Amino acid sequence: MRNENGYNPKLISTRELFKSDLDKGKARLQVPFNQVKTPDFLTEDETRIIHENAMKIRDDGVPVNLVDPRMNKHALELRKWKMKGNWNYVFVKGWNDVLDANKSNSFKEKDVFPLWSFRSGTGKLCFALTPKIPATALLQENLAVAAMVLLLEVNLVRTKERELVFLYYHKKIHQATTTHNKCKVSWLY
């Protein structure tokens, strides 16, 4: 991002790589709309271009730069496609170059990479696929949440009102183990 004089970084998705993302025959990286954490990363013009491409009104999507985990810059195109009834942002026209440049980095199925958007100094839409999140970091996050749950369970033995509140937040806490969102637990008195 620094090399591009980048600004306005936004976490788009914490993306797990699937077999289809690594398939050079498919030549694309897809990001399902329901996994996008910050949906306002496109300008009005970019949104219009992507929509027109999806409706087959225009041939091209939005040209973007993507910086891979090894700090290589690649020219790609961002589009949106409907696959199996769900909309996805899709990086095409250059995704195979990203795969080739990261062979020694060994992209593997189920590796998790944070995907960020940012603007270059000229305002061009750029993305950064940052180094993968080690499995130990995800494990540590899950252990921290589990410890919080155990601590709450010990403190909940006192009253039924608290137990009801805990049951509600217990569900929310387990959902948070797959994200990086913080849980807020409040008590009813």
Swiss-Prot record:
Pfam hit, one: At2g31720-like
Location of this chain's protein in the cell: Nucleus
InterPro entries: At2g31720-like (IPR005508), DNA-bd_pseudobarrel_sf (IPR015300)
Gene Ontology molecular function, alphabetical: DNA binding
Gene3D superfamilies given in the database record: DNA-binding pseudobarrel domain
Keywords attached to this entry: DNA-binding, Nucleus, Transcription, Transcription regulation
SUPFAM superfamilies: DNA-binding pseudobarrel domain
DNA-binding region: 33-133
Positions of disulphide bridges: none
One GO CC annotation: nucleus
Full protein name: B3 domain-containing protein At2g32645
